[in-house]
C-alpha cells in the first residue's frame, strides 16, 4: 500500500514537472514572438474608454509588456491614438509634439461643469450664434496664442490626470500655456449646435477652445462630441479596438504592426555600411559623404534629423551637423 502511494506521488510529481516544462517552453515561444513586435499601430480609440484602459486591454490580449501610446485622449474623446510596441517606444518622444487635428461639435446655450455632456448644467441662455458671427469669431480664434487647459482635461498634475482630480473635487489651478491654431473652420451648423475642424499644436485643449469661442459669441456652449482625425504627418488609416482584439493571437498582430520607422518622414533616410553601423551602435559619430548629404531635405521642420538603418538589425535616429551624424537613439533589432 505504501509502495503504491509512493508510486502515485512520483507519477504526480512527474506530471507536474512535465507540465512546468511545457509551460516554460510555451512562455519562451511567446517571449520570442513578443520580441518580434517592434513597431506601431494607429488605433481608432472608442469614446467612453480612457487611453490607458485601451492600452491595458491590448497588453492583456496579446501578453505584451512593452507597450506605450502617445497623445492621450481622455475618455470622452475618440479617434487617432498611436500605439508603440516593443522597441518603438524609444521613438515616442520624436512625435509627441506633433500637431493634432480634431472634429468636434458644440451645443449652444448651455454651460456644464466639465465642458462636455457628462457634466452638470451650471448656466444657460437662449443665444444661438448666426453663421456670420461664427465665421468672424473663428478668424479671431486663430490669433489666440495662450490657453489655460480645462480642469476636465487629460493634462497631468504631479502624475495624475486633471479630470481625475476634478471629479474628486480636488481644488487645483492650471497655468496658461502657448498654443498655435493652424486651422479652425466651421464644417456644419444646425439649430442649436455646430461642428468644427481644428488643426492645432500639441497641448491645445478642445474644451477650452469651445468655451472661449462660446464666450466670444456671447453665449454658452459645451462639447457634445470630440474625435481626433489626424496626428502630425502619420497615415490616417486606423484600426478599431474591436478589430484589433479580434486578431486573438500575437502572430496575427505581428502581421499588421507598422514598421518602427513609419512615424518619421521618408526624405532623410540612410542605408548604413557595416563599419558605420558598428560605430553608431557604440555611440560613435560618423562622417557622411557630400553626395549622401545632397539627398537629404534639411530645414527647421526636420531638425536635421536623419534615420539610418543597417539591414533589419539596427535602427538609428541621428542629428546631422555639417557632415557629421551624431546618434541620438540607437535601437538594436537583433534580439
Segments (PLM) and residue ranges:
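Accessory RNA 3′-end/elbow-binding domains used by RNA modification enzymes
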Residues: 2-46, 52-73, 77-80, 98, ...
Amino acid at each position: 500500500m505504501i509502495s503504491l502511494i509512493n508510486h502515485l506521488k512520483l507519477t504526480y510529481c512527474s506530471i507536474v514537472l512535465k507540465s512546468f516544462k511545457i509551460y516554460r517552453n510555451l512562455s519562451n515561444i511567446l517571449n520570442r514572438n513578443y520580441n518580434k513586435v517592434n513597431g506601431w499601430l494607429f488605433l481608432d480609440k472608442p469614446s467612453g474608454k480612457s487611453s490607458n484602459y485601451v492600452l491595458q486591454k491590448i497588453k492583456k490580449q496579446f501578453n505584451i509588456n512593452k507597450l506605450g501610446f502617445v497623445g492621450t485622449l481622455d475618455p470622452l474623446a475618440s479617434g487617432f491614438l498611436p500605439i508603440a510596441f516593443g522597441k518603438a517606444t524609444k521613438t515616442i518622444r520624436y512625435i509627441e509634439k506633433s500637431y493634432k487635428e480634431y472634429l468636434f461639435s458644440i451645443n449652444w446655450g448651455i454651460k456644464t461643469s466639465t465642458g462636455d455632456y457628462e457634466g452638470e448644467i451650471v448656466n444657460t441662455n437662449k443665444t444661438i450664434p448666426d453663421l456670420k458671427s461664427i465665421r468672424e469669431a473663428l478668424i479671431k480664434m486663430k490669433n489666440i496664442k495662450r490657453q489655460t487647459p480645462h480642469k476636465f482635461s487629460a493634462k497631468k498634475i504631479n502624475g495624475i490626470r486633471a479630470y481625475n482630480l476634478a471629479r474628486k473635487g480636488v481644488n487645483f489651478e492650471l497655468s496658461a500655456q502657448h498654443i498655435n491654431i493652424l486651422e479652425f473652420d466651421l464644417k456644419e451648423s444646425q439649430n442649436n449646435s455646430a461642428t468644427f475642424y481644428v488643426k492645432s499644436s500639441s497641448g491645445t485643449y478642445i474644451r477650452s477652445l469651445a468655451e472661449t469661442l462660446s464666450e466670444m459669441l456671447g453665449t454658452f456652449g459645451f462639447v457634445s462630441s470630440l474625435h481626433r482625425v489626424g496626428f502630425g504627418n502619420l497615415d490616417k488609416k486606423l484600426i478599431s479596438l474591436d478589430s484589433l482584439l479580434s486578431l486573438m493571437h500575437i502572430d496575427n498582430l505581428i502581421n499588421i504592426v507598422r514598421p518602427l520607422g513609419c512615424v518619421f518622414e521618408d526624405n532623410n533616410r540612410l542605408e548604413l555600411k557595416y563599419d558605420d553601423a558598428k560605430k553608431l551602435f557604440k555611440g560613435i559619430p560618423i562622417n557622411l559623404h557630400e553626395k549622401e548629404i545632397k539627398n537629404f531635405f534639411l530645414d527647421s521642420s526636420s531638425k536635421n534629423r536623419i534615420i539610418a538603418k543597417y539591414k533589419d538589425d539596427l535602427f538609428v535616429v541621428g542629428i546631422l551637423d555639417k557632415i557629421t551624424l551624431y546618434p541620438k537613439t540607437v535601437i538594436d533589432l537583433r534580439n
